[in-house]
Amino acid sequence: MSKLVVFLFCIQVCFIQNVYSQCLGRVGPGGPPLGPYGGPLGGPGYGPVGYGGCGGYGGSGIGNVAVAGELPVAGSTGVTGQVPVIGAVEFAGPACAVGSVSISGACGPTCGCGGSPFY
């Protein structure tokens, strides 16, 4: 086999791993049921069992979105269930709006305002 074919094959394998790691989350190289039952890595210095999760990149990050212009918005929105949102929204400039907003519930357990704080 030529070196180019081997190189392209390796690139394809990396692409496939990247795509499917988004769906599997933090599943380790041995799969979810096999992680706790594996042997220790590199001797007893790593504990009695192997590591359970060494999954691919989860796809989270920080980004900015800028929108300029007129934004005519009309209608109503109803959200029922759990909506995990952590972040901030900032408006700069005049924003003519009419309506009401009602937010009820509690934030996640990590912030400490809705549940017990997580340490």
From Swiss-Prot:
Protein keywords: Repeat, Signal
Region (Right arm): 104-119
A Gene Ontology molecular function term of the record: structural constituent of egg chorion
Chain segments carrying region Left arm: 22-55
InterPro entries named in the record: Chorion (IPR002635)
Signal peptide (residue range): 1-21
The keyword Membrane is assigned to this record: no
Region (Central domain): 56-103
A GO cellular component entry from the record: egg chorion
Disulfide topology: none
Coiled-coil regions, chain positions: none
Pfam families in the cross-refs: Chorion_1
GO biological process: chorion-containing eggshell formation
Role according to the record: This protein is one of many from the eggshell of the silk moth.
Family: Belongs to the chorion protein family.
Protein name: Chorion class CA protein ERA.2
Originating organism: Bombyx mori (Silk moth)
Lineage: Eukaryota, Metazoa, Ecdysozoa, Arthropoda, Hexapoda
Gene this chain is encoded by: ERA.2
